[in-house]
Amino acid sequence: ERPSYTGATESWNGSAWTEVGDLNTARHENAGFGTSTSALSATGRDPSLTAVTESWNGSAWTEVNDVNTARRGAGPAGTDNTSGLIFGGYTTDRIAITESWSGTSWTEVNDMSTTRFRPAGTGSFSNALAAAGQETGGGNTATSEEWDSARPVGAWTSANAMNTGRRQLAGGGSQTAGIAF
């Protein structure tokens, strides 16, 4: 039996977790980034694919402009609720679509070189890293790609691959000092 979808949100203070204001739309497989005082949650499944985006201010979630492509299992990169990226994910198959968040709205930007579902994501809007995930056809990949918004059109380029291909990873850190697990 599958667990029910939840909007539960918990905040870490360095020693303990505290239940805080729940997401307005309960879901799973959403992409999120930020801090305990400034975060963003986008997309997911509730149980249908959703494009819903919510912004966190440290005490409550507020629904803001939706992403352009509803999906689940996208990779996230961002440091707060004012800017960030989501990339890849799953609609009716794995996708390479990347969208950037300006603090107000989402814009589709250059796609990743490869489709991937449930990649690890880390970094910021300016410099992000997508690692591993599941490719079209269902196989796990170890490939990585780096995002650089300063390139003429903001683009992904190949980076060194992980040692082991896998999916459903979490990521943390920056583009140049990240972790995937």
What label would you give each PLM region?
Residues 1-181:
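Polar, enzyme-active/binding microenvironments
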